[in-house]
């Protein structure tokens, strides 16, 4: 198996090294792992692409590249430049430092990389490690993802359903904020929505009077409705949420026919 690995935390992020280990385990001795990751931190960029300006692409070693762009840019660089003659069988994005459950999924560059892979016709999965009191002080806070990541990916590769949608499925996988041995299992979930304040902005001033803002995140330890991603994670389960790039609110289409 030939696997492309990317992320949004950047080429030097510890989670990327964890995902490289997972990918190497999946690829096996006859397989290949290619890395095309952002040269710099790209958290929160979502599915953006840099189509208004070029991106520098640097070769750092065998099958290892850094692009000065978003995770989606990295996937495009891989599929259409560095791997154009040897395309990947699978794209893995992550392992993100922090959860991408609930509304975080909407902002996530980690998911943006996986989504672009799916739009390009390649099976893709985003992997994220929830941080909380149960794992942030561990020697390796990513140990749940490292221990269980390959198993989850294998199960999804063998179980992916056939569908007639033009939008290929991709998967949002979130590992709970616990030690590897405390993971309770896997739950297939829907995307949750946390109640109360989500992201916000705080106004501040520099010593010379310049005005600026800090974007602040909401409470990540707030659970969501049962059977959703964040609820599963905070209960010690790995969440797997199947996703597509189709943003249509299908439940509203019929109700809106009256305006035609």
Swiss-Prot record:
The keyword Kinase does not apply. It is found in: Cytoplasm. InterPro entries: SurE, SurE-like_Pase/nucleotidase, SurE-like_sf. Its main location: cytoplasm. It catalyses: a ribonucleoside 5'-phosphate + H2O = a ribonucleoside + phosphate. Keywords: Cytoplasm, Hydrolase, Metal-binding, Nucleotide-binding. One of its GO terms (molecular function) is 3'-nucleotidase activity. Its EC number is 3.1.3.5. It comes from the Bacteria. Binds 1 divalent metal cation per subunit. GO terms for cellular component: cytoplasm. The keyword Hydrolase applies. A divalent metal cation binds at residues 8-9, 43, 96. Its cofactor is a divalent metal cation. HAMAP family: SurE (MF_00060). Nucleotidase that shows phosphatase activity on nucleoside 5'-monophosphates. Belongs to the SurE nucleotidase family. PANTHER family: 5'-NUCLEOTIDASE SURE (PTHR30457), 5'_3'-NUCLEOTIDASE SURE (PTHR30457:SF12). This is 5'-nucleotidase SurE. It comes from Ruegeria sp. (strain TM1040) (Silicibacter sp.). The lineage of its organism: Bacteria, Pseudomonadati, Pseudomonadota, Alphaproteobacteria, Rhodobacterales.
């Amino acid at each position: 198996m030939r696997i492309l690995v990317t992320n949004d935390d950047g080429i030097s992020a510890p989670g990327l090294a964890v995902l490289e280990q997972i990918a190497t385990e999946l690829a096996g001795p006859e397989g290949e792992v290619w890395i095309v990751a952002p040269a710099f931190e790209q958290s929160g960029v979502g599915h953006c692409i840099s189509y208004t300006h070029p991106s520098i692409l640097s070769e750092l070693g065998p099958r290892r590249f850094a692009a000065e762009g978003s995770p989606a840019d990295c996937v495009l660089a891989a599929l259409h430049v560095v791997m154009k003659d040897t395309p990947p069988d699978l794209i893995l994005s992550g392992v993100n430092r922090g959860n991408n459950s609930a509304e975080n999924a909407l902002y996530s560059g980690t998911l943006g990389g996986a989504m672009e892979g799916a739009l390009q016709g390649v099976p893709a999965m985003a992997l994220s490690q929830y941080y909380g009191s149960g794992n942030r002080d561990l020697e390796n806070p990513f140990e749940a993802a490292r221990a269980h990541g390959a198993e989850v990916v294998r199960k999804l590769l063998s179980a992916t359903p056939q569908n007639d949608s033009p939008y290929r499925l991709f998967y949002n996988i979130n590992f709970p904020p616990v030690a590897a041995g405390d993971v309770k299992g896997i739950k297939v979930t829907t995307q949750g929505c946390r109640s109360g304040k989500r992201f916000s902005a705080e106004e501040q001033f520099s010593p010379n009077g310049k005005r600026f803002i800090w974007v602040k995140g909401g409470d990540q330890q707030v659970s969501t409705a049962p059977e959703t991603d964040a609820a599963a994670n905070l209960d010690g389960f790995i969440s797997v949420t199947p996703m597509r790039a189709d943003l249509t609110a299908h439940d509203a289409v019929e109700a809106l026919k009256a305006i035609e």
